[in-house]
Structure formats: structure tokens, C-alpha cells
Amino acid sequence: MKRKLICWLPLLLLIGCSQPTYRTTSLTPDKRAELLLKELTLEEKVALMMDTSQPVERLGIKPYNWWNEALHGVARAGLATVFPQPIGMAASFSPQTVYEVFNAVSDEARAKNTYYASQGSYERYQGLTMWTPTVNIYRDPRWGRGIETYGEDPYLTSRMGVMVVKGLQGTNDGRYDKLHACAKHFAVHSGPEWNRHSFNVENLSTRDLYETYLPPFEALVKEAGVKEVMCAYNSFEGEPCCGSNRLLMQILRNDWGFDGIVLSDCGAIADFYNEYGHKAYSDAESASAAAVLNLSLIHISGPRDRQ
């Protein structure tokens, strides 16, 4: 009996050590993702397209919450270093300083994520996907969220934004990204705040669009390799930004070659059809069908979005 067990031992060890191909670390991340997608059912894929991604236990996929913030330090996850607001950092006119700030932020975020994961906790503000920087142009001082921006100048905003992304994501020579940064809010989103869910940008000249509002986003995509872009609440030329073929497909994907994640702002898809939004679609089903053509991730912020 002992001799038989010894004969079978190599085979048993081989079976025990075998793992799905998509978990082979020697493969590129893109190849591993491609192999993993083939294993997922349609229902599982849909569940992974929301900010609160559900686990797929049979494939070893743990839950993940995409929502995390690092506007000027790791936010809402216990103690962390608090740096000046972006508008203050912009006043330094020092891109290198901004890089050093967000390199430190990414160190803290990584450490916190490692700790939370070791405790089996995957809640909001504990992940590695930071929804920053805000590279909208601060044109009107009445806009309450202007402090989140790097000011009114597209060039300065571009330089600062590029350094934020590089500080958060790390160098491109690594096998994995340190974190994900997210360029937001795409596009032409600079107030007013009170009607951001229904405001439509119209009569904007092509020159103003390309010289004022788009340069920071283009720089973050082409120079910094930002991994995520968040579409805005407002409409652009009659289409909700999160359903705008011109913004998300023609400009972002085709013209700039962005191949990362496009996600909606918090609850933006509900604005496609609800009474206080754009009323561009009649119901949740048609709104979702339109959104999914352009989006990789849909943010669900409350009960009204789950209709």
C-alpha cells in the first residue's frame, strides 16, 4: 500500500499545483484578462461592471469596490497625510512638487489596501482605484468645487494633472500599476453646481472646446497613460456626456487612442431618463442600453440608480 501511494504522489502533487491559465503570472495582464473573460458568464460580467463588483468565488475573484478618493491625500480611510487642496498646489507652479505629493499618497494608499485586504475587508475607500485628478477648468469663481481643480489655465492644469497621474500610477517600467488614477469629469464640466444633472453645453465653439476644455484630458491620456476616465453629469450638444458618442468614442477612444476604463459619475446614468435630469431616454432600460455602448463601469450611488 505504501509503495502505491509513493507512485501516485507526483501526480497528486501536479493536480494540487495546477491552476487556471488566467492565473499564470508569467502572462501579460492583457492576456490574463482575455482568458478570464472567456471563463465568465454574462451575468458575472454584468455584476463586475458596477462600482461594487461582486465576487466570483468559483474563479477566485474577490469582491472589489472601485470608489476611492485621493484629491489631496488618501480620503475617508482612517488617518492619512493631508496635503493642500489642488488649487493651492497649482499656485506652487511646481509640477515636481505635485509628483512627490502623489507619490507619497500612492505609498499610503497601497499600505492601507494591503492592511484592509489582510483583514478580508473590501469596502468603499479601501481599493486601489483613485478617482482623481479633477482636470476641469475653473472658469467661474462661483463654482463651489473649483478648489478641486488646478485653476483656469489649460496648460498649467495639464502639467499638474500629468504629474498627479504619474505619482499615483508609478513608473511605466513596472509590471503592474501602483494605483489607477482617473481623469474627471469628461467633459466641459465647470459648473454651475446646482443644475449639473440637467445642464446642456451648447453653442460652444470648436476652438474653445479644443483649446480650453480638452487639453488636460488629452495630456493625461497621451502623456501620462491615465488608466481611467470619468464622464460628467452634464450633457454635451444634447447628449448626456456618459452617452456621448462624440466625446467617448470619437475623441477619447478613436482620436486619442484611449484603451482604459471609462466610468460614469455617481448615479449619472439615472440622469439619462429621470425627471430632474436630461430626459434623453424614456426609461432605465433604454438609458442603460445607451450607456453600456460607451462605458466600462457604471457607478451606482443609491436606490434611484438600481431601478
Walk through the language-model features, giving the residues of each.
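Bacterial N-terminal signal peptides
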Residues: 8-15
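Positively charged n-region of N-terminal signal peptides that target proteins for export
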Residues: 1-4
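Glycoside hydrolase catalytic-domain context in secreted enzymes
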Residues: 17-306
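Short amphipathic alpha-helical "recognition" segments used for binding
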Residues: 6-8, 188
